[in-house]
Amino acid sequence: MQISGMLTMTVLSVMLVICAPGRSTRRISFAKARWMMAGGTGLIALQFLLQHAFGFRQMGVTQAVCCNLLFFTPSSLLCSMSILYMQRQGKVSWKEWLIGSSIYALSAGILIGTAVLDGVPFREESMALRIAEYVSSVLYVVMQTYIFSMQYKAYMRLETAVDEYYDRSRRDLFGWMGLSMKTMALMVFLVPLVIFMQGAPLVIFSISFFFIISYSTISLYTYGVSKDVERVEEAEMSEEGIVKSEKFAAATESSLLSSAGANFSLFTIHSTLNRWIESGHYREHNLTLSIVARQMGVPQKQLQEWLRQSEYKKLAGLVSSLRIKEAQRVLIEHRDWSVESVADYCGFNDRKYFHQVFQQYTGTTPAKFQQNN
């Protein structure tokens, strides 16, 4: 198991370092994140190598736990921070790095200092080292909880930006982040309990951790070299532009401008929405907030504000509602059309998503709706 784990982690590290396309490595967020993830998987490979070479698990739990914590903690730090880098487009402050690194430095200092000063040979069981390991495992939980809190905030911000920007649910773009965060957070709280065990619980934990890190690594690589990262960053940049616009408007302290903007939003969007609907633009594929705002001839910021205050809440709500109404009409008037043809005509990218949204709005499937009407 140790040899296979070491080889797998080595392959993952090499994949991140060597196999990334040039266009992806020029993207700041992925360029840094892949090196951090490669460092994390490399440390795990080194940990497996030391465990196998010196037989720590066979010598006793104390030595194995000490080795695990010394390598497992910085590995988790690097892997977790690499995901945070992707979430924030590389915008991680030195203070945030310093806090995480300081916690690890304290943990490593306690372990190494105890092993050197307690007077007990490392190959023998040591109560002092065991206590130091308990303290170190608690520090590990503190470090990972701190990072997870930052990841969660960044994930929620991305989720909001993407949900409001695209014409349909796009969790497929960054869903791996949420799964990686949740599974790694679960492993974090199991570490202080499982790491001191032997037998089946430790084996199950080790295998689970191995697969979680592998999944996160492969997902980060796939995401980094795909177009998905550009789509997420486009939505995020749009949201940041709107926020900056709001701050600038607030800084002007001009009630006249604010009033004019509000009147523009209320009057213009309502008057242009019907023209936009009549034009059939809502049936176009892959609409975004910026595209719709340009088609309607209104500022993107005010369109977003109007959507938030309306019954639709976001662009996907507006577009999906219009597309489903159109789909109902087409299903009745063109009974010879296939479901795929109806979905494509109404702007849905695939049949599965069309079925999902249609059932959500009507409570039935397209086929049953057509039979009953």
Language model segments and positions:
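N-terminal low-complexity or simple alpha-helical regulatory segments
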Residues: 1-110, 125-128, 135
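Membrane-helix interface motif
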Residues: 112-122, 153
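Alpha-helical transmembrane segments and their immediate juxtamembrane interface regions
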Residues: 86-97, 150, 208-236
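Membrane-proximal linker segments that couple transmembrane helices to downstream signaling/catalytic modules
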Residues: 221-345, 352, 357-360, 364-373
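Alpha-helical transmembrane segments of multi-pass integral membrane proteins
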Residues: 26-46, 100-102, 129-194, 207-215
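Hydrophobic alpha-helical transmembrane segments and immediately flanking/interface helices
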Residues: 69-78, 197-221
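Alpha-helical transmembrane segments and their membrane-interface junctions
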Residues: 57-63, 118-121, 185-202
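Structural signal for membrane-spanning alpha-helices in multi-pass inner-membrane proteins
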Residues: 16, 51, 108-115, 191, ...
